[in-house]
């Protein structure tokens, strides 16, 4: 069976000579449909770089990235952009909401770019916002929303439509513990509907929602394990790496 996401011997190098930085070193990772994978590691371990390369926002220096069996390096930039819109949902630390669009317009923009009628797209967008308890703010602009509300809008944009791969970089960073748990529950629910999910987090409580945890250190995968039951077990596992 073809994996939803596969990284084969992926390395990423920034700079050259004395300023050369190895952000990733020969990373191998596969993520299946209906699987939620958490990525943990210290600051600077390559977690965010892994996500941007997996999502075709950066190119690997070495190695292959396959989404649904398609090698991203083998298709044109236009086809890569189309794959990003149709197949991959993103949630990043800085939200990336467009200030001139309302919350629901931000959510539905990828759908409308793919030709979905505005009325249909809005209905889908409102449903996604409702799932995150922020539908009442649908017609507000980003600067009228709190940090937590902007984060939930960004997550709604990532899950709207029929995307098969969800990539989330610290998706609960602006939320309190209750809403953070709600977000992880939503990501978990998405994977149970056939989506493959990868979430970067430094919080063991949230990583314990995953099926599997990948530990990064100095750009390398140092271990992969089935998520232990409970955050205390996960913290102990992390400390041993």
Residue ranges and their predicted role:
Residues 2-216, 221:
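ABC family nucleotide-binding domain
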Residues 220-241:
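Conserved beta-strand-loop-alpha-helix hinge in the C-terminal portion
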